[in-house]
Amino acid sequence: MNPYLNAFLRSIIEAITEFLPVSSTGHLFLFSSFFPFYGENVEFDDLFDIFIQSGAILSVLFLYREKFKSQIVSSFRYILKQNSDSEGFHFLIQICIGAFPILIAGFIAKKFLDTIKARPDLLEILSGAWIFGGVLILVAEWYFHQRPEEKKSIGFKDSILIGIFQCMALIPGMSRSAATIITARFLGKDTKSSAEFSFFLAVPVLLAAGIYKLIKYRSILNGNTIPVLMFGFLVSFLLCTLVIRWFLRYIQKHSFSVFGVYRILLGVGVLVLTKLI
């Protein structure tokens, strides 16, 4: 397959799945199993995924640029004691608290996770994670609707719990978005607050992973690979911006249940496919 066509299709997959609770990593692995870049160049596949995830990060920063700007400015003024409004400072602290557990867990368990990703039965593992995550989404939605009222604000304790359970995303196919949204729903948070906090947590988590992989694979950056990487980055950014806007409109009127059903059907379908191949 032409590398630019491959890059375009992967960018579409990334844009659609990164912020939806369906596992972008799982979908990208499934695609690359059939259509790898440059034959068996797994390193380039991995590096390209980081570039399109960076495009996704930029889309969050672009859409919420005013919020991030105001919260950062407010934080500095609070630290310098130029005002008494601590909202911005607390917002940034909550993001750091929520991101900290998965960054530490990912660093500690790196070799073990690399071993899992290299297993020949990875598709079966992905299938199990898709199904398990789908069931959790449906249970979380059912539990949420048993509560007397929904909550919009996410406090420090919520950030800690969401951050801890975000570590489930280290399991291939579980999904970082799913782990954070499921936890937020169990805590009684409304759909928009759950989704947006998941978006915000993505920034430090994906940024840290991106910097690490960029340093690791810097030797394969050259005149042939950089144009393809930048093409994927730009396509991902543009499409992610559209998907996030659609997603926020969708969850204003619907629950996350449809994504749970989708995950279960996908997991069962891939599991059946692996048995037939």
Swiss-Prot record:
It is an enzyme of class 3 (hydrolase). The keyword Transmembrane helix applies. It is found in: Cell inner membrane. The chain crosses the membrane at residues 19-39, 44-64, 89-109, 122-142, 154-174, 195-215, 224-244, 257-277. InterPro entries: UppP (IPR003824). One of its GO terms (biological process) is peptidoglycan biosynthetic process. Bacitracin is thought to be involved in the inhibition of peptidoglycan synthesis by sequestering undecaprenyl diphosphate, thereby reducing the pool of lipid carrier available. Catalyzes the dephosphorylation of undecaprenyl diphosphate (UPP). Confers resistance to bacitracin. This is Undecaprenyl-diphosphatase. It comes from Leptospira interrogans serogroup Icterohaemorrhagiae serovar Lai (strain 56601).
